[in-house]
Swiss-Prot record:
The active site is at E34, D45. It catalyses: (1S,2R)-1-C-(indol-3-yl)glycerol 3-phosphate + L-serine = D-glyceraldehyde 3-phosphate + L-tryptophan + H2O. The lineage of its organism: Bacteria, Thermotogati, Thermotogota, Thermotogae, Thermotogales. Keywords: Amino-acid biosynthesis, Aromatic amino acid biosynthesis, Lyase, Tryptophan biosynthesis. Its EC number is 4.2.1.20. This is Tryptophan synthase alpha chain. GO terms for cellular component: cytosol. Belongs to the TrpA family. Pathway: Amino-acid biosynthesis; L-tryptophan biosynthesis; L-tryptophan from chorismate: step 5/5. The alpha subunit is responsible for the aldol cleavage of indoleglycerol phosphate to indole and glyceraldehyde 3-phosphate.
Length: 239
């Protein structure tokens, strides 16, 4: 099995359910989980994930509360924090304190959707930041990736916001990017079926699935969500 990263929005429908999901996913042997930090203006996300952000914010979920929850669990997969830039740089106790806490928790990297690759070097964040590549990313920008320290590269397989798609465009471009970079390449944005996962695995190192899992969380009673999410991940993995 190649790589598989699940996106789980923290605090949707509440942090206790998030904790149960993270523990339940541990049995599946996946590569990692992106923990989504809620934000009031999630410009890169589609309506399904935007709803999760708004519910979590109404629940009073903050990065600090997310870190407290993460400190209570132990998992075998890699953890990543996906957050817009504002909550990171405006962490109440200071950005350095946040980065120190992330390091203690073993979080492998930050995923910051509103931080373009060319701007990463201008932001004073001493932590591995996952770079984004899109179908319209220029070759000279792609080549910059080889000079950054990151756990993987996040390929956005569709223009615009996140959400489920029926097709897998840009396969040729994904292959070209894979040839140019040294880091593992994970493809996300729009993957919701095992057939799509298999197609990505043929040309990249792994997939990232978000909206398809958040939709499961949205459509099921709270006490059934962890089990239903695990079932969906198993389906995506072809288990």
């Amino acid at each position: 099995m190649k790589g598989f990263i699940a996106y789980i929005p923290a605090g949707f429908p509440d942090l206790e359910t998030t904790r149960k999901i993270l523990i339940a996913l541990n049995e599946l042997g996946i590569t990692g989980v992106e923990i989504g930090v809620p934000f009031s203006d999630p410009v890169a996300d589609g309506p399904v994930i935007q709803l999760a952000h708004s519910v979590a914010l109404r629940n009073g979920v903050t990065i600090k509360k997310i870190l407290e929850m993460l400190s209570e669990i132990s998992v075998d997969y890699d953890l990543y924090l996906m957050s817009y830039l504002n909550p990171i740089v405006n962490y109440p106790e200071g950005k350095e304190k946040l980065l120190d806490e992330l390091k203690k928790l073993g979080v492998k990297g930050l995923i910051i959707p509103d931080l373009p690759l060319r701007e990463v070097k201008n932001v004073d964040i001493a932590y591995p930041i996952v770079p984004f590549v899109a179908p319209n990313t220029k070759d000279e920008e792609i080549d910059l990736i080889n000079s950054v320290q990151a756990p993987f590269v996040y390929y956005i397989s569709r223009y615009g916001v996140t959400g489920e798609r029926e097709d897998l465009p840009f396969a040729d471009h994904i292959k070209r990017v894979k040839e140019r970079i040294k880091l593992p390449l994970f493809v996300g944005f729009g993957i919701s079926r095992h057939e799509q996962v298999k197609k990505v695995w043929e040309i990249a190192d792994g997939v990232i699935v978000g909206s398809a899992l958040v939709r499961i969380m949205e459509e099921n009673p709270k006490d059934e969500i962890p089990r239903k999410v695990v079932e969906k991940v198993k389906e995506l993995l072809g288990k």
